[in-house]
A protein has these predicted regions:
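Short, surface-exposed secondary-structure boundary micro-motifs
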Residues: 1, 12-13, 34, 55, ...
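Short, solvent-exposed loop/turn segments at the edges of secondary structure
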Residues: 4-6, 22-24, 45, 76, ...
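Hydrophobic or amphipathic alpha-helical targeting/insertion segments
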Residues: 1-38
Length: 188
């Protein structure tokens, strides 16, 4: 039996994985178990799956997957950031606690996720399942295919206010990473 966690499925067709995932052959699988259910984490409509992906759109708003040599070696970076398939996504929430299950479904882009007002990120799970205890962090780094689970409590927020989970700029680890690897989309 698999332990609770946020997982994802995607194509593994030889030499076609990137293109098939890009065209939508991927998604999230959420596994629950008795241990997780005893924790009484936010569930149902308060447990939100969030998939972040970058995509290239042509001038007439069509998806483009034309890989150059460099893209085939290191992955490509899209010109738009999508959240659950939408550009400039807005997720309305109630003034209560939520569980956010976030998957980086991008081909090569790394995200440094943080709240726009500097509020600490509370991580409760990763690819390996739930953490032993929550971790309060200034931000989380999310590489392609990585997942993170966040706990966020909006109960102290005024109705109608915004808290934006955004991709913060950062310096990459080698010379080509800093150029274009910084997502500038946001989740609202």
């Amino acid at each position: 039996k698999n332990p609770a966690g946020t997982n994802w499925y995607h194509s593994h067709t030889h030499e076609l994985t990137g293109a098939q995932v890009y065209q939508g052959l991927a998604g999230m699988i959420i596994i629950s178990d008795d241990v997780e259910q005893k924790l009484e984490l936010p569930s149902g409509e308060y447990d939100l799956p969030i998939i972040i992906q970058d995509r290239n759109f042509t001038h007439d708003n069509q998806l483009s997957f034309n890989l150059r040599r460099h893209d085939r070696m290191r992955g490509f970076l899209g010109n738009s950031i999508l959240v659950n398939g939408q550009v400039n996504s807005l997720i309305p929430v109630k003034t209560r606690a939520y569980r956010l299950r976030i998957l980086n479904g991008s081909n090569a882009r790394i995200y440094k996720l943080g709240w726009n007002d500097g509020t600490a990120i509370t991580a409760i799970g990763t690819d390996g399942g739930l953490l032993e205890k929550p971790q309060n962090l200034p931000y989380v780094m999310l590489a392609p295919a990585e997942r993170v689970e966040l706990w966020v409590d909006f109960s102290g927020r005024k109705p109608g206010s915004e808290l934006i989970l955004q991709s913060l700029t950062y310096q990459g680890t080698h010379s080509t990473m800093g150029r274009g690897m910084m997502g500038n989309g946001s989740m609202r």
